[in-house]
From Swiss-Prot:
Keywords from the named record: Antenna complex, Bacteriochlorophyll, Cell inner membrane, Cell membrane, Chlorophyll, Chromophore, Formylation, Light-harvesting polypeptide, Magnesium, Membrane, Metal-binding, Transmembrane, Transmembrane helix
Organism: Rhodobacter capsulatus
Side of membrane Periplasmic, spans: 45-49
Protein's gene: pucB
This protein's name: Light-harvesting protein B-800/850 beta chain
Pfam families in the cross-refs: LHC
GO MF, any single term: bacteriochlorophyll binding
Length: 49
């Protein structure tokens, strides 16, 4: 019997890749929101302009 579980997490490779894709998507959304927040705060502060 073959064991398709990857590493100590007990997840299969397909499951690990699915979780990883969600993590990457969440990081991209967070980064985009942070970028927008930084741009808006730079526009709103009079001493930077």
């Amino acid at each position: 019997m073959t064991d398709d579980k990857a590493g100590p997490s007990g997840l299969s490779l397909k499951e690990a890749e699915e979780i990883h894709s969600y993590l990457i998507d969440g990081t991209r959304v967070f980064g985009a929101m942070a970028l927008v927040a930084h741009i808006l705060s730079a526009i709103a502060t009079p001493w930077l302009g």
